[in-house]
Amino acid sequence: MGAYKYLQELYKKKQSDAVRFLLRVRCWEYRNLPVCHRASHPTRVDKARRLGYKATQGFVVYRIRVRRGGRKRQVPGGRTGGKPKTHGVNELKPSRNLRSVAEERVGRRCPNLRVLNSYWVNQDSTYKYYEVILVDNSHNAIRNDPRYNWICKPVHKHRELRGLTSAGIKARGLRRKGTHRASKTRPSRQANYKRRNTVVFHRYR
């Protein structure tokens, strides 16, 4: 096995003494850094390379922390509006995963870069920490590389905001193959559930 294979197997045993100590020390370090900052190199090189990272010009890695837990609804001044049944504020769950949220925030922070992928690096009781791989689409090293110049096309602008990254595709429920298995996710899961569970009585004429 190569070195990256050993690293991959090491991260499968996160409860081992060595990995627990390593994650605890790194978590203390990440807590004292800004919320979103550029990393000098990937923390998990094996994972980053599997997701498309190369140690060449044009590739950037950003580390970001996202607060764990449910999502509070934005209600200015406490004015929820509507019926009391829909006045929920605290117990709402986000429809996307936190990795997709992390990609979105980094993408807004670096509008001149394209988000390629992301991966988990750490977590504690309050935050989850992710590293996001970004590509400089205006760099000649990327534009001249046939393996990566597809991301330079205008259609891939802010792909993280439109659910086109790996985390976004998973949040949309499109991780399945075949025509019938993902059919219930369009136009949305909520619309499909409503259509299949609403009893309609047509008026007798």
From Swiss-Prot:
UniProt keyword terms in alphabetical order: Ribonucleoprotein, Ribosomal protein
Transmembrane region(s): none
Gene Ontology biological-process annotations: cytoplasmic translation; translation
InterPro entries, per database record: Rbsml_eL15_core_dom_sf (IPR024794), Ribosomal_eL15 (IPR000439), Ribosomal_eL15_CS (IPR020925), Ribosomal_uL23/eL15/eS24_sf (IPR012678)
PROSITE patterns tied to this protein: RIBOSOMAL_L15E (PS01194)
Chain residue ranges for the region called Disordered: 70-90, 172-197
Gene3D superfamilies: Ribosomal protein l15e (3.40.1120.10)
GO molecular function: RNA binding; structural constituent of ribosome
Domain of life: Eukaryota
Gene Ontology CC entries for this record: cytosolic large ribosomal subunit; extracellular matrix
Pfam families: Ribosomal_L15e
UniProt-listed NCBIfam families: PRK04243.1 (NF003269)
Family: Belongs to the eukaryotic ribosomal protein eL15 family.
Protein name: Large ribosomal subunit protein eL15
Organism: Dictyostelium discoideum (Social amoeba)
Gene that produces this protein: rpl15-1
